[in-house]
Design a protein with these regions (language model features):
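Residue-level signal for alpha-helical context at structural boundaries
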Residues: 20, 73, 92-93
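Structured loop/turn residues at beta-strand edges in well-structured enzyme cores
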Residues: 36, 53, 92
Length: 120
């Protein structure tokens, strides 16, 4: 199933993706304002991939409670302000990557809580 879903992602239009873009890795830089006031931590695993991945990391993190209406509003805000040319494609990638990322997070969490691997 995942292979079929991943085939739906546009692998030609790659962007820099930090892959760990969530609240714990954002910091406020006190003497700056606007976009310059946001600092990023833990970016050493950056790769080229779908721009939707980092937005998913921020808005759909299984470890955080983000109001679904707020997440939808922020997704629409991103689409309105960003350089996304195919909004339907972006939304589809967003959904696919949200599923993938949150399954991964939940498997890791369960594995740690049980102190044993899920798969051998």
């Amino acid at each position: 199933i995942f292979f079929e879903l991943f085939d739906k992602i546009n692998h030609r239009d790659k962007k820099l993706v930090l892959r760990d873009y969530h609240a714990d890795n954002l910091m406020v830089i006190a003497d700056q304002s606007g976009e310059n006031a946001v600092g990023l931590l833990d970016f050493q695993d950056a790769v080229l991939g779908s721009a939707a991945y980092d937005l998913v990391s921020l808005l759909e993190d299984a470890r955080r409670d983000v109001d679904p209406d707020l997440a939808l509003d922020l997704l629409e805000y991103y689409l309105a302000r960003g350089k996304v040319t195919d909004k339907l494609q972006f939304k589809n990638e967003y959904k696919i990557l949200s599923l993938q990322r949150n399954i991964k997070i939940n498997i890791i969490t369960i594995t740690k809580n049980r102190n044993q691997p899920i798969l051998n």
